[in-house]
Amino acid sequence: MFTITQPDTQPSDHIQHKIDNKTKPLGALGQLEAVALQLALIQQTEKIEIRHPHLLVFAGDHGIAQHSLSIAPSEVTAQMVANFLAGGAAINCFCRTNDMALKVIDAGIKVEPEDHPNLIKQRLGHGTEDFSQYAAMTDNTVLQALEYGANVVEVLNQQSCNLVGFGEMGIGNTSSAAAIMAALLNIPADECVGRGTGIDDQQLQRKVDLITQALDLHAEQLSDPLSILASVGGFEIAQIVGGMLKAAENKMTVLVDGFISTAAAMLAVSMHPEANHYFIYCHCSDESGHQRMLQHLNATPLLSLGLRLGEGTGAALALPLLRSACCFYNEMASFEDAGVTV
């Protein structure tokens, strides 16, 4: 479904030499230097740039949410989608201040929203099934979700966008992400489950128990990423996977947000390991398990701000760092240019 090749590493010595010969001590710009190197390898150009950056927020409801594993009911998903479209959410603020276009994708929320210029409807249903009792979705729905996510990114690629961030909204999706993590890493649910929106100890234990029950129920269907998505995934998570893989296929830079988006990235990398070369992990969230996910992906996040909101907020906040990496790479003088001797 996707043809992904890792960036040509032949220019890496030239790129690193260019970075090392800027007017600074070796490595003095820390992680920004690694970002510049990654962007230069992805783009394979003498100057690197960010063109028409977009943040895509995929929204979907989850059958597992009927067990009250969140402080918020499922109705909040649709309410927050309306808030995104009205421009009133945190992600709207961060996209506005960082000059990043925002699109909202209805992957399958309970209540279909009204049409809006910034809304893309790719509905797969009125929410997934309760994966503690049934498969979250069918195998065919997973394939449709991947295609839907890929289509959104392909449109952006045709519009000369070369960087896309992925966010999400869906009451219950931390449960889905934790189940995905447990299945991929083959570890117990209690090592993956966090408090999500801020649940108490009793709800936390209920969440662990339900996810453990689900993993036992679907044990024979958790052998590959697509089956994991069908068993315990979410409509929005599956579409994000498709979008990430299409972005990598198109050699676009991918900004990975928090716990849920990183679960999607884990699935994408499990399907196509080469995709990870195009992924920049924006932050380490406060959600339990996220740090372990990042370690599994051999990822060093750019930020650690204690975020646990989702929506793509960490991705939007990281964008200025990427712009700064481009600026120093393109414009900072070399020792020779500046007449500085060391």
Swiss-Prot record:
The keyword Phosphoprotein is annotated on this UniProt entry: no
Superkingdom of the source species: Bacteria
GO biological process per UniProt: cobalamin biosynthetic process
UniProt xrefs under CDD domains: DMB-PRT_CobT (cd02439)
Molecular function per GO: nicotinate-nucleotide-dimethylbenzimidazole phosphoribosyltransferase activity
Active site: E311 (proton acceptor)
EC number(s) on file: 2.4.2.21
Disulfide bonds: none
UniProt-listed Pfam families: DBI_PRT
Keywords: Cobalamin biosynthesis, Glycosyltransferase, Transferase
Annotated catalysed reactions: 5,6-dimethylbenzimidazole + nicotinate beta-D-ribonucleotide = alpha-ribazole 5'-phosphate + nicotinate + H(+)
Pathway of action: Nucleoside biosynthesis; alpha-ribazole biosynthesis; alpha-ribazole from 5,6-dimethylbenzimidazole: step 1/2
Enzyme category, top tier: transferase
Family: Belongs to the CobT family.
Function (record text): Catalyzes the synthesis of alpha-ribazole-5'-phosphate from nicotinate mononucleotide (NAMN) and 5,6-dimethylbenzimidazole (DMB).
Protein name: Nicotinate-nucleotide--dimethylbenzimidazole phosphoribosyltransferase
Species of the source: Photobacterium profundum (strain SS9)
Gene encoding the protein: cobT
